[in-house]
Amino acid sequence: MTILNHTLGFPRVGLRRELKKAQESYWAGNSTREELLAVGRELRARHWDQQKQAGIDLLPVGDFAWYDHVLTTSLLLGNVPARHQNKDGSVDIDTLFRIGRGRAPTGEPAAAAEMTKWFNTNYHYMVPEFVKGQQFKLTWTQLLDEVDEALALGHKVKPVLLGPITWLWLGKVKGEQFDRLSLLNDILPVYQQVLAELAKRGIEWVQIDEPALVLELPQAWLDAYKPAYDALQGQVKLLLTTYFEGVTPNLDTITALPVQGLHVDLVHGKDDVVELHKRLPSDWLLSAGLINGRNVWRADLTEKYVQIKDIVGKRDLWVASSCSLLHSPIDLSVETRLDAEVKSWFAFALQKCHELALLRDALNSGDTAALAEWSAPIQARRHSTRVHNPAVEKRLAAITAQDSQRANVYEVRAEAQRARFKLPAWPTTTIGSFPQTTEIRTLRLDFKKGNLDANNYRTGIAEHIRQAIVEQERLGLDVLVHGEAERNDMVEYFGEHLDGFVFTQNGWVQSYGSRCVKPPIVIGDVSRPAPITVEWAKYAQSMTDKPVKGMLTGPVTILCWSFPREDVSRETIAKQIALALRDEVADLEAAGIGIIQIDEPALREGLPLRRSDWDAYLQWGVEAFRINAAVAKDDTQIHTHMCYCEFNDIMDSIAALDADVITIETSRSDMELLESFEEFDYPNEIGPGVYDIHSPNVPSVEWIEALLKKAAKRIPAERLWVNPDCGLKTRGWPETRAALANMVQAAQNLRRG
């Protein structure tokens, strides 16, 4: 029984973000469709070859996506919303881009599909839309075309296909409501057709992803698995693939399925390998997800060997990444600025492939010498002074309940804030960032590369902040922001100014579409050596009589959008960050900043996948926010911002944050999200986002007014704010001016009644 290895997927964007650049060039009309397609082919060929050279036996095909793999699956099944369809019924790459972005080089612009987080990761998918009576058919053959590509290059491949039940689970019904699970029998023939086509190509194994099987699914959904997979069996071997959690709670459902193998995440799940082995059918292959696909840490391979060795030789076994390597940067070897000690602690996607090769070889041979050598740096890290800061640990241990309480309740604070700011009804503001122009990016890059001295850099940033204030005053906004010209990313910026973080040069991971982020890495205890945001906030406030918001990223979001340590709990990291940012709130307040926004867009996405684990997480997540904010005086207004959220099941926790104002992303869901706040009788102020900043389309005054009137039916108008869904850094100035002008006009119209 020779053990093989494989990955569940590989990063798509390219080491230098080649895919992002090609997409954006095509969208801007600066390159042709053929040129875009050529970049995709080149990246796929390179990535297959890199995995093969690193020692991977079975290469994933179908993990590449032009925007998002859930959207790719939707097109495969012919699931195209009516507003995005081509007149002749055909489907092409622009159809895909219109669904994702609301517009493309061809076709009519229309509202983009809703976007939300992929399970509890920082990747986003486009939510499939279902309407009653819709038809499904194989319309987008990208998977088959890419399999042909890989086979022509001589690779041994394993196609990757998002499973039918997970795909349905991830979608939403639009219009007349019905049970979306009723569509299952309509999509299975398309899956059968795809599997038949793969069988014709001589494919032995297909990785069929059903991560919904790690959730606490309703019984009807669990019951749907057996008939669905009865319909799919027989043409190729199916590797039922799960990740992000363990499968033990749903193992009875899984073991009844007519599949030939099961992949389990042995990093994030709590499944015991020996118990799994006992419960799985003896002829099934077990794919052991031993290498963390979601983090950047070098694996302790001696530990991984011990974890799996007891079942070696007892069943067919593969070793694998826990999930797709999509969530990891590509290659550590190009990181030239990390010092040798810290660099020795990490492994990116290509290094994880190498880890899988080392592990496979050791399991096949029994020789573990190479594993011990590989694991030595991560074992040495446990005693590094770079990791432990006694002062931080002491401060954390001294936290009391009082440290997470504002001095007075919201009603008292609101009165003090009204007296201080005297804002009109329907106050207008933005979420924080303004367009990151080429000039701004060049300025930061020149400074980073040493081509610009500190004085000239600061002069340049000051000018961009001045322009942002002038623009907002001209537009008539009520509460201003400084625009964040100095910030490359809302998390990276704070990480750069906090001890305990390190940064990469090329550690890009895909967030959605062409958007990539370069998450900081938490390597040790977190503290704040000096004020971070005070200087620029104070400068911006000096230029206007209107209030300027101080802008902070909250502790849970910094945690969730960074690569965390694996040697302490997430709670510990979040509270260390909260204490550091608490000092920032105090310093902003002392500098005369009266409104401070602490963004927590990631609060919900950090939820454990199983509801039974939620309470513990929400308790420390809320406490971290309150530790951060509680130092503020009564007349300092604390805002928070959240996006991509379904709120109804965590409203208690959102209220417990005790922010004076919460701004939320609601426009893509047509204000549906406000139902939760209405039903809960949310007591504080709310700014429901009135337009979608992820699309370049400019909303009309009438559209915004209609949304605000809809909001006012649910929330008293005196508690409503008017703002976009999210920050504006990815937009251009022309559409930003136009959209904000319409937003301000809509608010003014409503004030006049």
From Swiss-Prot:
Segments crossing the lipid bilayer: none
Annotated EC: 2.1.1.14
UniProt keyword list: Amino-acid biosynthesis, Metal-binding, Methionine biosynthesis, Methyltransferase, Repeat, Transferase, Zinc
Residues given in the record as L-methionine binding sites: I431, G432, S433, E484, D599
EC top class, as a word: transferase
Positions bound to Zn(2+): H641, C643, E665, C726
Pathway involvement of the protein, from the record: Amino-acid biosynthesis; L-methionine biosynthesis via de novo pathway; L-methionine from L-homocysteine (MetE route): step 1/1
Cofactor note: Binds 1 zinc ion per subunit.
Residues binding L-homocysteine: I431, G432, S433, E484, D599
Record flagged with keyword Amino-acid biosynthesis: yes
Single GO MF descriptor: zinc ion binding
Listed cofactors: Zn(2+)
Listed InterPro entries: Cbl-indep_Met_Synth_N, Cobalamin-indep_Met_synthase, Met_Synth_C/arc, UROD/MetE-like_sf
Chain sites annotated for binding 5-methyltetrahydropteroyltri-L-glutamate: R17, E18, L19, K20, K117, R515, C516, W561, E605
Record PANTHER family: 5-METHYLTETRAHYDROPTEROYLTRIGLUTAMATE--HOMOCYSTEINE METHYLTRANSFERASE
Family the entry assigns: Belongs to the vitamin-B12 independent methionine synthase family.
HAMAP family xrefs: Meth_synth (MF_00172)
Protein name in UniProt: 5-methyltetrahydropteroyltriglutamate--homocysteine methyltransferase
Native source organism of the sequence: Escherichia coli O157:H7 (strain EC4115 / EHEC)
